[in-house]
Structure formats: structure tokens, C-alpha cells
A protein has these predicted regions:
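A short, charged, amphipathic alpha-helix used as a generic interaction element across diverse proteins
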Residues: 23-47
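Generic structural motif
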Residues: 11-13, 26, 53-55
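Surface-exposed loop/edge segments in extracytoplasmic proteins
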Residues: 15-21, 57-62
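Short aromatic-glycine-(Arg/Gly/Cys) micro-motifs in beta-strand/loop hairpins
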Residues: 1-17, 45
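Short, mixed-charge low-complexity intrinsically disordered segments
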Residues: 38-68
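Solvent-exposed serine/threonine-rich low-complexity stretches and specific carbohydrate-binding patches
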Residues: 22-25, 66-68
Length: 68
């Protein structure tokens, strides 16, 4: 099992979570996160967060946030 899981969390305009994508590769997760760094993302989402969960320590860390 991988030590880290990277998550991209999409929050709808009404403030409710819409989707969570999970990745074991930070590089792939960052690439997917950056695909949404466009003005039209604001039409669907109020916020998109990129975070990391460390399974060894149980800690979560927000790495980047896009707020629209």
C-alpha cells in the first residue's frame, strides 16, 4: 500500500462536495488538478482543493486550493 493518497475535492457552487478523485501519484494528481485551473470551472465549482493524506501518520494536508 502506498504511504500517500492525493485527493482532488470539487465543491459545487452551493457549497456541497461534488466529487473526490484519489490518486497515488502526486505528479498525476497535480496534472489533473491543473486541468481545472480555467475560468469556466467557476461555472460549476466554488472551490477545488488538492490535498494529501499520509497513511503512516493519519494526517491530511491541503497542498493547493483554487477558489472561484
Amino acid at each position: 500500500m502506498e504511504r500517500y493518497t492525493y485527493e482532488i475535492i470539487f465543491t459545487r457552487l452551493d457549497g456541497q462536495p461534488d466529487e473526490i478523485q484519489q490518486h497515488t501519484s502526486e505528479e498525476l494528481a497535480r496534472e489533473c488538478f491543473r486541468l481545472f485551473d480555467k475560468p469556466d470551472s467557476a461555472e460549476m465549482y466554488s472551490k477545488i482543493e488538492f490535498s494529501c493524506h499520509d497513511w503512516e501518520t493519519g494526517m491530511d494536508e491541503i497542498l493547493e486550493t483554487m477558489t472561484f
